[in-house]
From Swiss-Prot:
The gene is adk1. Catalyzes the reversible transfer of the terminal phosphate group between ATP and AMP. Plays an important role in cellular energy homeostasis and in adenine nucleotide metabolism. The keyword Nucleotide-binding applies. It catalyses: AMP + ATP = 2 ADP. It is found in: Cytoplasm. One of its GO terms (cellular component) is cytoplasm. Residues 1-21 are annotated as: Disordered. Its EC number is 2.7.4.3. Keywords: ATP-binding, Cytoplasm, Kinase, Nucleotide biosynthesis, Nucleotide-binding, Transferase. This is Adenylate kinase. Disulfide bonds: none annotated. ATP binds at G13, A14, G15, K16, G17, T18, R121, I130, Y131, A189.
Length: 206
């Protein structure tokens, strides 16, 4: 049996990274993120230029370039979990043209919970380690005292990021829901409970 092809949707802070790692460990598939794929293939020639040209200019990499890069990663993978793609409806339609996925799972988390999760993050500037004020603070008092909040984790910036996600990705969610493919997972449960539900959805689809 071929390895599963899994699409994991969810807002920033929904827990996609944690659950993607669980999927990789359990099913032995590749973890494909847009950012990693672009960085790994930044010099890949496409009809519209290389990712590097846009990244170095501080511009968003256009959809046709992102699509080609992600397709290359999918073609090389024996099963995958896609995390952070598709980000908009045109990418979702492109993905449907190039491959079939077994599971489309949405980690469903409310706005207030997302804001709490993201604004509570703290970073150790010396190590880059990430902590959280509510459920993951370091034991070492010296480390606790030097923790900082990153600029992109302030409440204003978090809400802006979530607004952008809603605007771009809600049509993607609607697209898969209309196709009858979307499985909603309660992302506000504990990470272990989320994983139990997600694994059950994957196993049910295979």
């Amino acid at each position: 049996m071929s390895q599963p092809k899994i699409l994991l949707l969810g807002a920033p802070g929904a827990g996609k990274g944690t659950q993607s790692s669980n999927i990789v460990d359990e099913y032995g598939v590749d973890h494909i993120t847009t950012g990693d794929a672009l960085r790994a293939n930044k010099d890949m020639e496409t009809e519209h230029g290389t990712p590097r040209e846009f990244m170095e200019a501080g511009e968003l990499v256009p959809d046709p370039v992102v699509n080609e890069i992600v397709q290359a990663a999918i073609d090389e993978a024996d099963g995958f979990v896609l995390d952070g793609y598709p980000r908009n409806l045109s990418q979702a339609e492109y993905l449907s043209d190039i491959t079939d996925v077994d599971v489309v799972a949405l980690l469903d988390v409310g706005r207030d919970e997302l804001v709490d999760r993201l604004t509570g993050r703290r970073m150790d500037p010396e190590t880059g380690d990430i902590y959280h004020t509510e459920f993951n603070m370091p034991d070492d008092e010296e480390v606790r005292e030097r923790l900082v909040q990153r600029d992109d984790d302030t409440e204003e910036t978090v809400n802006e990021r979530l607004d952008v996600f809603d605007e771009n990705t809600q049509p993607v969610i609607d697209y898969y829901e209309d196709e009858g493919e979307l499985v909603r997972i309660d992302g506000e449960a504990s990470p272990d409970e989320v994983w139990d539900d997600l694994q059950a959805a994957i196993d049910d689809a295979l």
